[in-house]
Amino acid sequence: MNNSVPTTAICPPACRACGLRKTGAFSPIAVEELDFIEAFRSGTTTASAGATLLHEQKPNGKLFTLYAGWAFRYKTMSDGRRQILNFLLPGDFIGLQQKFADGSMHGIEAITDCSLCVFPREGLWELYRNHPSLGYDITWLAAREEGIVDDHLLTAGRRNATERVAMLLMHLYRRLDRVGMAENGWIDFPINQQHIADALGLSLVHTNKTLRRLRQLGLHEIEDGRLRLLNTRALERIADYYDTPPAQVPLL
């Protein structure tokens, strides 16, 4: 069983003191690689809830690891309609796409107050040249992200509203449980119904009705910004979604 996530929301001054690494949810790393990551890291930063971390089509030359808090990746249309691409949780690596595109391909907004480790984008070349195992880790993270996008594309294209909401609840619960952020079946759930609607391509009214229906079936409860899943097997069957995050993943 993983230990709980760090009680402090402030990034530690040294990577050796990283509370995320102590949870057991992330892959072990060699001492020399950890030293390189600490040298690679240019600093830390915080963002208030609602702040924009990355602007669409505006490169900022930075990469991030989310240490504490929730955020989301999104794209907007010219008329202001927004699609949430995925939710970002502690340990997620952020900003890699802008290395391979002319500017950030998406925006990132903080849902809660966030703490992040900051890395210079130009340092990736040295990482790949001198630490190929870390380069493999970044490739693995990119491939994992692609798999999550595939699941969301399937959700948007083929799952109905009930299946979509059930899938999202299971997906977020599994990810948080893996990093020790589930307690007695409860997880923090700071997203609102508009976030859910924008992530699943549903109207706000349809989202509200679907959440209410699943609650009436005794499958979940949401209270004071927290979510409890009451029957995960039933939600998995409804969503036809059985993905389980790997026990350990790379962490930069």
List the model feature ranges, each with a label.
Residues 25, 36, 51-113:
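Cyclic nucleotide-binding regulatory domains
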Residues 86-151:
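Cyclic-nucleotide recognition modules
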Residues 44, 63, 87, 118, ...:
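Short aromatic/basic micro-patch
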Residues 1-49, 93-94, 99-100:
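Cyclic nucleotide-binding regulatory module and flanking cytosolic helices
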Residues 174-252:
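Phosphate-/nucleic-acid-contacting segments
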Residues 68, 122-123, 194, 233:
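Alpha-helix/helix-capping structural signal
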Residues 133-201:
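Polybasic "coupling" helices that flank or enter modular domains
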Residues 46, 64-65, 109, 221, ...:
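Well-ordered beta-strand positions
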